Amino acid sequence: FKFMDEFQEYISELKEDFPNLIICGDYNICHETIDIHDPIRNKKVSGFLPQERQWIERFLNSGFTDSFRHLNSEPNQYSWWSYRANARNNNKGWRIDYALVSEPLKNNIKRSYILQEAKHSDHCPVGVELIF
């Protein structure tokens, strides 16, 4: 977790000079059970390990909001599917791609989405719209 801890430290320092941040990307971690198709069978799989989930929880608690879950509590909303076992067609996915918004921007979130129709990769693009 050295990289993740150093990343969080870097973002904390960056936030001091630039408080309005959106940190987007593939975190390779499902935060909550709602973010993975089978939390029971995957509880010991990298990407859903307790220590990984604790790290993303700490990151969010440092002043960030998961823009997608801020507005959407629907299950079965994923951004990644394995190429194996027809996972995408059966929607057996994971939500591991995030647009995390710093606290000062939280109330500006208008929409956050996953473009599940995009099929260029095993991941789908995620996006967030802010209003000012």
Regions found by a protein language model. Give the residues of each.
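Short helix-loop capping/hinge motifs at secondary-structure junctions, enriched
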Residues: L105-N108
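Short acidic, gly/pro-rich beta-turn/loop elements at beta-sheet edges
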Residues: D35, K110, D122
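Hydrophobic/anchoring residues in structured secondary elements
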Residues: R69, R111-I114
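Metal-dependent phosphoesterases centered on the DNase I-like endonuclease/exonuclease/phosphatase
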Residues: F3-K92, I96
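Hydrophobic alpha-helical positions that pack around
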Residues: L100
